[in-house]
Design a protein with these regions (language model features):
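N-terminal start-of-chain detector that recognizes signal peptides
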Residues: 27-28, 52
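Short glycine-rich, polar/acidic loop-and-turn segments at beta strand-coil junctions
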Residues: 39, 60-62
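Intrinsically disordered, low-complexity segments enriched in glycine/proline and serine/threonine
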Residues: 10, 31-32, 58
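Amphipathic alpha-helical transducer elements in NTP-driven molecular machines
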Residues: 51-53, 66
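Short, glycine- and small/hydrophobic-rich beta-strand elements in well-ordered beta-sheets
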Residues: 30-48
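Short, flexible turn/loop "capping" segments at secondary-structure junctions
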Residues: 2-4, 48-51
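Catalytic "initiation/cleavage/transfer" segments centered on a nucleophilic residue
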Residues: 1-10, 14-23, 27, 63-175
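Conserved RNP beta-strands of RNA recognition motif
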Residues: 54-60
Length: 175
């Protein structure tokens, strides 16, 4: 990884060891970035609760080396430097959106910094189809045949589903 250069790098920030104002420090770097919701429910393979942490992804405009990414991560108390192969996939990982065996975190709690747009990052055609497939599967598993019910469920529990339902040209009414 020493010689690799990419536009997207990631790290983990542990609440207990990061500066208390680490998000402000990150904002002061003026680098587009995403900060995951606080991961405070993750478990190890043996069921032990992991240390509370955040995932941080930097979205540079140009190729950067591991040393350049590390320089930013050290300012915020980041542990490790991870080369991100697929920006969209890692963005989804911030909330475990494609990992049903892991705790699902709310995509609305992702912090977007310096012009990065998390909602736009997730809003792709394949993602829309994946979400619609999830909704259909959920409806089948839970015997749901009311569009109004699934729309309200999504509004209250799954913002990613709610956006797709609203943006996909579907319509509901109480009549």
């Amino acid at each position: 990884m020493e010689n690799k250069r990419t536009k997207t790098w990631a790290t983990i920030v542990y609440s207990e060891s990061a500066p208390p104002n680490w998000i402000e420090i990150l904002k002061e770097q003026h680098i587009p970035a995403f900060v995951s919701p606080k991961h405070d429910k993750d478990l190890t393979d043996d069921g032990t609760l992991k240390k509370e942490h955040y995932h941080v992804m930097l979205l540079f405009e140009d190729l950067k080396s591991v040393e350049q990414a590390k320089e930013v991560f050290e300012k915020i108390g980041g542990v490790g430097v991870e080369l991100v192969n697929c920006t969209r996939a890692y963005a989804r990982y911030l909330c475990h959106l494609d990992n049903p065996d892991k705790v699902q975190y709310d995509a609305n709690e992702v912090i977007s910094i310096a012009g990065a747009d998390y909602t736009e990052m997730l809003n792709t055609s394949p993602n829309t189809y994946t979400i619609i497939a999830e909704i259909i599967e959920y409806c089948q598993q839970n015997d749901i045949d009311s569009y109004a019910y699934i729309l309200l469920y999504a509004k209250n529990n799954r913002s990613d589903w709610f956006k797709v339902l609203c943006d996909s040209g579907t319509l509901s009414s109480n009549s």
